[in-house]
């Protein structure tokens, strides 16, 4: 059974009167009304985008047991929070279990996540594995630990998913993570490869989903602040300087400010691939290509002057502006 879009009814049901004050309190000021209105828009937008991503990629199906990987960061908190709200009104039934991998990093507050998960009433499992010592022993001082740490973490989470009977593993990567991965692979890996919203795991035994695939990181930052999640900072990899991913993050933030629409268009391009206009001979039969006498609808007309003129994000102020073609960012 395919997972239908779960965004419309849930977002509408969750909508509150943004200008109404609680009983017994004075009427909201104009500033408070504006803040409440913007917060409500933010919540509706995130719920809609998550619901759309789930439907577009059939991420969650009837009877699924979704293992939500909770790190203690803003993204995984938001993912769990929105999935719980979506489940309340979803047209399908599915279970959620939250899983945290305690890697025994110094200073990690072990009590925070269990207390939070008990408070929200979510079944959870804390997996205790000292990967921190392994990483510190094997990675030379001054080198980034992300690669080894990620491999160790993936293997453990795949095993835990099997032990818990989970049918889907949900990770908290968002739109910006996906674009960053695309740029990293292009700039440093020499390949066109991103971070798919849904994929088969490395071991071939699990399906990994990314429900936040359509959500901007800035929206998640605002949402985490609004919901007051008990954020746990990562003092292993998050504090390492000069990480290439951090460079990509800064680049994307700068583009968002200077060229509105550019990052959205890059993200949208991942779903509009034209193999005949790339160079991968495994994706398109260039060697056997012959003139057919039939025009290619995806041919070089895409580079003619007229359609490009309105999408030039380097145009001077007052000139042509970039066209946002991302359907989920219309608020």
UniProtKB/Swiss-Prot annotation:
Q: Which residues bind [4Fe-4S] cluster?
A: 146, 149, 237
Annotated GO MF terms: 4 iron, 4 sulfur cluster binding; ATP binding; magnesium ion binding; sulfurtransferase activity; tRNA binding
Residue numbers covered by motif PP-loop motif:
71-76
- The protein's superkingdom reads Bacteria
Query: Is the Cell inner membrane keyword given for this protein?
Result: no
- UniProt key word Oxidoreductase: no
Tell me the SUPFAM superfamilies matching this sequence: Adenine nucleotide alpha hydrolases-like
- Pathway listed: tRNA modification
Which UniProt keywords are given for this protein, alphabetically ordered? Answer: 4Fe-4S, ATP-binding, Cytoplasm, Iron, Iron-sulfur, Magnesium, Metal-binding, Nucleotide-binding, RNA-binding, Transferase, tRNA processing, tRNA-binding
Where it mainly occurs, coarsely classed, is: cytoplasm
How many cofactor units bind, and how? Binds 1 [4Fe-4S] cluster per subunit. The cluster is chelated by three Cys residues, the fourth Fe has a free coordination site that may bind a sulfur atom transferred from the persulfide of IscS.
> GO CC annotation: what is one?
cytoplasm
* Stretch list, region Disordered: 1-31
EC number(s): the record gives 2.8.1.-
Q: Which cofactor does it need?
A: Mg(2+); [4Fe-4S] cluster
Which PANTHER family does the record associate with it? AMINOTRAN_5 DOMAIN-CONTAINING PROTEIN, SULFURTRANSFERASE-RELATED
Assembly notes: Homodimer.
Note from the entry: The thiolation reaction likely consists of two steps: a first activation step by ATP to form an adenylated intermediate of the target base of tRNA, and a second nucleophilic substitution step of the sulfur (S) atom supplied by the hydrosulfide attached to the Fe-S cluster.
Task: Report the protein name in the record.
Answer: tRNA-cytidine(32) 2-sulfurtransferase
């Amino acid at each position: 059974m395919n997972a239908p879009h779960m965004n419309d009814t849930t977002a509408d049901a969750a909508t509150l009167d943004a200008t109404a004050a609680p009983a017994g309190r004075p009427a909201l000021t104009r500033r408070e009304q504006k803040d409440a209105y913007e917060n409500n828009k933010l919540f509706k937008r995130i719920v809609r985008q998550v619901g759309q991503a789930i439907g577009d990629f059939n991420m969650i199906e009837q009877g699924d047991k979704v293992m939500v990987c909770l790190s203690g960061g803003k993204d995984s908190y938001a993912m769990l929070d929105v999935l719980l709200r979506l489940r309340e009104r979803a047209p399908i039934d599915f279970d959620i279990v939250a899983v945290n991998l305690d890697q025994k990093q110094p200073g990690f507050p072990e009590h925070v996540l269990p207390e939070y998960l008990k408070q929200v009433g979510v079944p959870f499992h804390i997996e205790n594995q000292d990967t921190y010592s392994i990483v510190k022993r094997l990675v030379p001082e001054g080198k980034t630990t992300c690669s080894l740490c990620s491999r160790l973490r993936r293997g453990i989470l795949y095993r835990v998913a099997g032990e818990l009977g989970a049918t889907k593993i949900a990770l908290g990567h968002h739109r910006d993570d996906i674009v960053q991965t695309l740029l990293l692979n292009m700039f440093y890996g020499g390949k066109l490869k991103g971070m798919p919203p849904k994929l088969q795991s490395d071991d071939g035994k699990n399906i990994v989903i990314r429900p936040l695939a359509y959500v901007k990181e800035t929206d998640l930052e605002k949402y985490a602040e609004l919901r007051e999640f008990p954020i746990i900072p990562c003092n292993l990899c998050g504090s390492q300087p000069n990480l290439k991913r951090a460079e990509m993050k800064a680049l994307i933030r700068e583009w968002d400010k200077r060229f509105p629409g550019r990052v959205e268009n890059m993200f949208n391009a991942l779903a509009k691939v034209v193999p005949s206009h790339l160079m991968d001979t495994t994706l398109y039969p260039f060697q056997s290509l012959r003139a057919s006498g039939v025009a290619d609808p995806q041919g070089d007309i895409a580079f003619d002057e007229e359609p490009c003129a309105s999408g030039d994000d380097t145009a001077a102020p007052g000139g042509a502006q970039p066209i946002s073609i991302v359907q989920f960012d219309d608020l």
